[in-house]
Regions:
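Low-complexity, intrinsically disordered short peptide segments enriched in small/polar/basic residues
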Residues: 1, 6, 38, 64, ...
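Short terminal alpha-helical segments
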Residues: 1-47
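Charge-rich, acidic-biased intrinsically disordered regions
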Residues: 38-43, 67-80, 106
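Amphipathic alpha-helical binding modules
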Residues: 76-124
Length: 124
């Protein structure tokens, strides 16, 4: 694998990790916090994760050599998670069990990407 491709994979992986970190905080706040401002705080982290997600998707589309089912699944699952989190925030849902389930699915897709990156790092 050439160095340019390795750099692009690393760059996309960084976008994935940043998106994951912010959406995780947004979901954790919406699911577990017990205060009246939790939805506003969650929305802030959702916005932050969405900005990184958009940048990741742009980078992915511009670099066709990065196309893989793992990244496609990441983007599809993020879209579903984002919609569910918006629903929880907009309705101030007190029982976000579907959000929890969607986040677990998203987390699995991130783990799949992490596994792919490990395999690619070991490939010479």
């Amino acid at each position: 694998m050439n160095n340019v491709l390795k750099f692009k994979i690393f760059e996309l992986h960084c976008f994935v990790q940043k998106t994951y970190a912010d959406i995780k905080i947004a979901c954790d706040i919406a699911i577990y916090q017990e205060n009246t401002s939790k939805y506003l705080i969650s929305l802030g982290f959702l916005n932050k994760s969405y900005m990184t997600y958009i940048e990741a998707k742009r980078f992915y589309r511009e670099n066709e050599e990065l196309v893989s089912v793992e990244f496609d699944n990441f983007f599809d699952t993020y879209d579903k998670l984002e919609l569910e989190l918006k629903k929880v925030i907009s309705t101030e849902d007190k029982n976000p069990s579907l959000l929890h389930s969607r986040f677990d699915q998203f987390q699995q897709k991130v783990e799949n990407i992490n596994d792919l990156i490990k395999v690619l790092q070991n490939a010479r």
